[in-house]
UniProtKB/Swiss-Prot annotation:
NCBIfam families cross-referenced by the UniProt entry: porin_porB_Neis
Name recorded for this polypeptide: Major outer membrane protein P.IB
Domain of life of the source: Bacteria
Family: Belongs to the Gram-negative porin family.
Keywords (A to Z) from UniProt: Cell outer membrane, Ion transport, Membrane, Porin, Signal, Transmembrane, Transmembrane beta strand, Transport
Chief place where the protein resides: membrane
GO molecular function, one term: porin activity
Stored SUPFAM superfamilies: Porins
Amino acid sequence: MKKSLIALTLAALPVAATADVTLYGAIKAGVQTYRSVEHTDGKVSKVETGSEIADFGSKIGFKGQEDLGNGLKAVWQLEQGASVAGTNTGWGNKQSFVGLKGGFGTIRAGSLNSPLKNTDANVNAWESGKFTGNVLEISGMAKREHRYLSVRYDSPEFAGFSGSVQYAPKDNSGSNGESYHVGLNYQNSGFFAQYAGLFQRYGEGTKKIEYEHQVYSIPSLFVEKLQVHRLVGGYDNNALYVSVAAQQQDAKLYGARRANSHNSQTEVAATAAYRFGNVTPRVSYAHGFKGTVDSADHDNTYDQVVVGAEYDFSKRTSALVSAGWLQEGKGADKIVSTASAVVLRHKF
């Protein structure tokens, strides 16, 4: 009996050496407060306030790889939200995939982040709860950042350069909503630059609604030939961090009422931080210019400031204190929102 157990153990050793599985995740919870004041014709027309204990993006995941020989590996990941507020359900509701990795690069299929979403860490360095995302995060530019049921290829890095291409079929993206994505990256001696592009035939998203006996994808009703271009650049030496970002959206609107219309939307953002021992203070500013892809006349003008600091208790446990101010519109018609949060985070 003992010999059989020893034989089984020895037989399992090569398998354990070539197939690695990692459990990982993060628990993030804290207290947040928010206040929103809407002005109409120069007068206060609506006030909303609140405070709550909230989840700030907790998650849990499993990932692994298997050595297939000749430098080829099978890679996989299954990740899902794990809210401490008990509001996340289901498996694989975050980035989840299976693929192959080798000297040629990595190819994956599944629910994959787009190149736009991959640049988010250098655009939005903040975290928020359910009701404060528009104030405590640089969320205006992030509206086009999504995860797609798609296939994606990422190249190996060469002389600091790397790239990616991604395709989401129309049957996974709503009515005629197939999309194409491209990403280019460069890093050298702390300097970095990123480009991310999205090209979509009709709108974006996976939900549909019926309007005047026609079915449309939402949230981008009537949007045709959507393009999103984002440039990000900066410097990071593990103490000083600076980044700037610019995003241009462009679309043609379809439908009898909006024939031949063509609109664009431009937004910019910047972030600076410096690490003093265990403390890292940070500040971000974002601005949106007039006009959106849905309407050239829509006043999308906004200004936003987020300030805060992180304190590292250890490599895995940290705290974040932040406060944000957002003004949408200007003059007599505007919405002014403020929010603050204290968050405790642990990664495993």
